[in-house]
Amino acid sequence: MGRKAAVSLLNRDGLFSWEALQWAEQNPGTVILESNPGDAANRTSFLFSRPLEIVRAETLEGVQGALERIDQAVQEGCYAAGCLAYEAGYAFEQRFLEKKTPSAPLLWFGLYERPITVDRRSGILEGPSDDVRYIRESVRTQRRSIAPSTQHLHFRAAVSEARYLDAFAKVQHYIEAGDTYQVNLTFKLSAQFSSSAAALYARMRNAQRVSYGAFVNVGSLVLLSCSPELFFRRMGNRMILKPMKGTIARGRTLAEDKERSTMLMESEKNRAENLMIVDLLRNDVGRIARPGSVRVKRFFDIERYETVFQATSTIEALLKDGVGIPRILHSLFPSGSVTGAPKIRTMEIINELEESPRGFYTGSIGFFTPRKKAVFNVAIRTLVIDRESQSAEFGVGSGVVHDSRGVDEYKECLLKARFLEEELDDFGLIETMRWDSRRGWFLLPYHLRRMKDSASYFGFRFSSSELKDELKQVVRRLRRHSGNGAFRVRLVLDRIGQISITHSRLDLLEGKQFVRFSPLALDAENRFLFHKTTNRGEYDRELERAEQEGYFDVLFRNKQGEMTEGARSNVLIRRGDTFLTPPLECGVLAGTYRSYLLSSEKYQVREQRLYPDDLLSADELFVCNALRGLVKVAFPEHAMTA
């Protein structure tokens, strides 16, 4: 199969398309495992469909037999793909056989003839021709939604901060008593959900681009995983484990990112937590590894994701001959990164203190092949949808050590769900520029630098040479067909580096220009305020209303009451010979003309926090942008209140 087969099943990012996801939602037994964005080690995505057999374990006593059946089928040439609940690990220790377990399956795997695979670099889709043809035809004829939309999730924590702090205090007692060194303490967030699982997964993977994503249709349950963590990868006799321990929120800009990344790298607490888990996993894999083959290849690397930085380490080992699937999981599962150390005693503490079974959260999702290959994630950042009860659960947790602070740990847990609550739709980067038939581009280096910085921040593909080539073509078209004058040129860059450019004639402003305040209070922690993107619905709606009322722009404040900016301009006031403009940290976009003014010797411009009264009492009020430059504005008399 080549490009032609891939058209209807893949989107332009090389991920499974909305239609393919919708088909997977309608067909129990389907497993999609995706690598996004598809790095060198994770360039292949998989679609397992039409299982030959389903292997389930509903009880602890049934787990071993289920694993043996999977092992047998894989040796006979089948592929196996599915998931294990955290509590499936109780089956490997006699002392856990009486512990609480979830009502959902402890283990669920489909056995398949062969998956459909996608090479993320080439975009080539391959697989059994009958399966590809069947799915393409099914996708073509299925009842489709008009667009992939879903309801907003309103999560409630199943454990209050007070109850969490009570459990946290008991963990500290166990640490002081020497029972444990670290406990990964977790709880659930829950929400009502009756919309499309496929649409929600499509939005989740836009918001959290990871190498170990999964969509698993178990029937009444659907698992949506955006896990960044590799549990283990098997390649013949070579094993790789990559525990993740250590988290910090990303900044709002590249500069803040650098500060946060350095803070995590230099955190003694996080390094100590990571080292504990590395030692635990070295011991676990050592049970099935050739003597002397276990080594730590990398320690405490910092990896960047959409909303957080994570610290990871990489462990490699060579398996002993004859080690099969049951023994691998018996030795490794669950991952020590989601238990703590020492593992067995800590699992007992977790069972005592956590209020409900974890289920598939902190379990694992992945596949085995007949060629002794396997990839499994640690099922964090994983949403479990129960279609019968029309509900969704999302687990969160953190590693608690002796110097942890309970309030901070609770906040870290909630942080890990932030990507579900942000605006999850895809977006592009924008630059709105001025081109003049006599002077050419205005502030072009400022525009390109800002787009490059935002592209780096969000992980967009950016090529300065390609952009300049596109802009040269625009100039040729304008000179050939549009005549003299000034033009508004709007450039949009999408995540994969595709460029779209539109232009229109820029008319002169006539008469006095007026502005008013917006009633909205913006959150200065919203990272999208610091980048010019298509994700600007509030700005567009407020500007449209203001223009209909005859205003040039509408001015915003943040939740602290500080002035930020206009919907299409930055704000300045003049006091004597000095111009003042709000600092970026208030929630301000680094406008290109604003940046030009701050670096110019012609104007005395400095940053200062401003409030509505400062604007109302200023000697003069201005707004500025790259299209209009510096524009003197005023409040009409009837709008002279904040």
Model-derived regions, located:
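Extended alpha-helical targeting/anchoring segments
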Residues: 2-432, 554-558, 642
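Helix-start/capping segments and mature chain N-termini
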Residues: 274, 307, 311, 408, ...
